[in-house]
């Protein structure tokens, strides 16, 4: 029996002798074969899009309209619902057909990508430089590399504008802050003021500041996409039309592995930011679909017990808790009236069900006594019992279930997965950056392939 280990089946130009990389080094064998590397990337895109389509249809098939999305372990339908597809007032799903269409479109796209990937991996030209010079490249050709960078930036900018167009012209997006409990609406009055948009970038990442993660209205989010899309498109045109300056030519390493390390570093940053965004932000990730944030569940519990004990006759304005601080209400470091108890650390929380009860100095005691609506009680009781805690040690006072409840919030899944992937990508960034710098300095040739242990082992056959 022949295997890829003994080389006879390895395709020309992709074996260990030609490339210096064994089969398990993956795309490293294709560093200088632009046509085959194209095939690998297109096939990979096909796998990604196939997963998206198949998982999308799987979630549609299992979806129960009577239960909230976050109780059903869904991670794709909440994204479609946030874009305004298939939902109505209060985030209620009124039509699952758009979700079905999304899944089918992704499956069809994946078939096209899969065909293209297989074609370029097996049948297409090994290198593109001769037949298709526009698509060909040499890794150390700085001008070509920045042109490719520019094309990528333009595509990213167009992607940002897709969200803008959806929000402005194609039915709008879901706004958790819409009056009456959230609804799909067109975003008409965009925030384009640079002081507001770029002010987010200058905020502290801590506490009540929260950097860009603190954004809490859709006008700012869509306006930010206008700015970002414009910057990406203009930057892309700039990189296509210009050559790298001398300082950039000197400062950067210009090799395939260096570009890989830059990309992994960028994706790592994206992963960490996405982790914080999905964990803390209930505007871009509405609680109706993703479940409450951790702070939101904690504040919801404090609110629920305030409502209960107030009905039982407690004076919530003056009752003292076991620490001598207010049991239900207390003051924040800056003087606002906030919920007391362990949830005090989450006094920054803003949520659509709570804001109507605030006055100019924090929570308004007269509103808490007279204006609490049944929908606010229902919402907070629901959120209190669906905290995204998993097995965190510090739960902000939320009563935790140990045996009975089988519930993991999509926020937990999405935040954890993006943190872990962000960390792994960061390690990959360090690894490939180190190798690329060493290779550029001329003292790193990789592992000595002549004395690898595997070469002295008995062949598998």
UniProtKB/Swiss-Prot annotation:
Keywords: Acetylation, Chlorophyll, Chloroplast, Chromophore, Manganese, Membrane, Metal-binding, Phosphoprotein, Photosynthesis, Photosystem II, Plastid, Thylakoid, Transmembrane, Transmembrane helix. GO terms for molecular function: chlorophyll binding; electron transporter, transferring electrons within the cyclic electron transport pathway of photosynthesis activity; metal ion binding. Binds multiple chlorophylls and provides some of the ligands for the Ca-4Mn-5O cluster of the oxygen-evolving complex. It may also provide a ligand for a Cl- that is required for oxygen evolution. PSII binds additional chlorophylls, carotenoids and specific lipids. InterPro entries: PS_antenna-like (IPR000932), PS_II_antenna-like_sf (IPR036001), PSII_PsbC (IPR005869), PSII_PsbC_sf (IPR044900). It is a multi-pass membrane protein. It is found in: Plastid, Chloroplast thylakoid membrane. The keyword Ribonucleoprotein does not apply. The modification N-acetylthreonine is found at residue 3. GO terms for cellular component: chloroplast thylakoid membrane; photosystem II. The chain crosses the membrane at residues 57-81, 122-143, 166-188, 243-263, 279-300, 435-459. [CaMn4O5] cluster binds at residue 355. It holds the Pfam family PSII. The modification Phosphothreonine is found at residue 3. GO terms for biological process: photosynthetic electron transport in photosystem II. It comes from the Eukaryota. Residues 1-2 form a propeptide. Belongs to the PsbB/PsbC family. PsbC subfamily. PSII is composed of 1 copy each of membrane proteins PsbA, PsbB, PsbC, PsbD, PsbE, PsbF, PsbH, PsbI, PsbJ, PsbK, PsbL, PsbM, PsbT, PsbX, PsbY, PsbZ, Psb30/Ycf12, at least 3 peripheral proteins of the oxygen-evolving complex and a large number of cofactors. It forms dimeric complexes. One of the components of the core complex of photosystem II (PSII). It binds chlorophyll and helps catalyze the primary light-induced photochemical processes of PSII. PSII is a light-driven water:plastoquinone oxidoreductase, using light energy to abstract electrons from H(2)O, generating O(2) and a proton gradient subsequently used for ATP formation. This is Photosystem II CP43 reaction center protein.
């Amino acid at each position: 029996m022949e295997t890829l280990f003994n080389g006879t089946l390895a395709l020309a130009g992709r074996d260990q002798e030609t490339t210096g990389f064994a089969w398990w080094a993956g795309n490293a064998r294709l560093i200088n074969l632009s046509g085959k590397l194209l095939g690998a990337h297109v096939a990979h895109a096909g796998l990604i899009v196939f997963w998206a389509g198949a998982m999308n249809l799987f979630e549609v098939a299992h979806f129960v309209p009577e239960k909230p999305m976050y109780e059903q372990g869904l991670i794709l339908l909440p994204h479609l619902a946030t874009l305004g597809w298939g939902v109505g007032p209060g985030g209620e799903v009124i039509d699952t057909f758009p979700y079905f269409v999304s899944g089918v479109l992704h499956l069809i796209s994946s078939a096209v990508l899969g065909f293209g990937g297989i074609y370029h991996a097996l049948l297409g030209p090994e290198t593109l430089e001769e037949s298709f010079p526009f698509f060909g490249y040499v890794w150390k050709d700085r001008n070509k590399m920045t042109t490719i960078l520019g094309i990528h930036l333009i595509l990213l900018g167009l992607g940002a504008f897709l969200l803008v167009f959806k929000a402005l012209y194609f039915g709008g997006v879901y706004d958790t802050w819409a009056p009456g409990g959230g609804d799909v609406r067109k975003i008409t009055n965009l925030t384009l003021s640079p002081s507001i948009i770029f002010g987010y970038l200058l905020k502290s990442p801590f506490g009540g500041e929260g950097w860009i993660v603190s954004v809490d209205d859709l006008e700012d989010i869509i306006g930010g996409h206008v700015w970002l899309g414009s910057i990406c498109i203009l930057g892309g045109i700039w990189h296509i039309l210009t050559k790298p300056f001398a300082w950039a030519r000197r400062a950067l390493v210009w090799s395939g592995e260096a570009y890989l390390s830059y990309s992994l570093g960028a994706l790592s940053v994206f992963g960490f930011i996405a982790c914080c965004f999905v964990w803390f932000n209930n505007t871009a990730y509405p609680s109706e679909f993703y479940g409450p944030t951790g702070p939101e569940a904690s504040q919801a519990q404090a609110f629920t017990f305030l409502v209960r004990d107030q009905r039982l006759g407690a004076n919530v304005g003056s009752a003292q808790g076991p620490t001598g601080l207010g049991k239900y209400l207390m003051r924040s470091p800056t003087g606002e009236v906030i919920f007391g108890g362990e949830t005090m650390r989450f006094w920054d929380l803003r949520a659509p069900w709570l804001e109507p009860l605030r006055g100019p100095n924090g929570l308004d005691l007269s509103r808490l006594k007279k204006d609490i609506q049944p929908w606010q009680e229902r919402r907070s009781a629901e959120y209190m019992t669906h905290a995204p805690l998993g097995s965190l040690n510090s739960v902000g006072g939320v009563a935790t279930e140990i045996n009975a409840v089988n519930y993991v919030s999509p926020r937990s899944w999405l935040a954890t997965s993006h943190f872990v992937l962000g960390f792994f990508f960061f390690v990959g960034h360090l690894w490939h950056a180190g190798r690329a710098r060493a290779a550029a300095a001329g003292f790193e040739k990789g592992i000595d392939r002549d004395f690898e242990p595997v070469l002295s082992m008995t062949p598998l056959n």
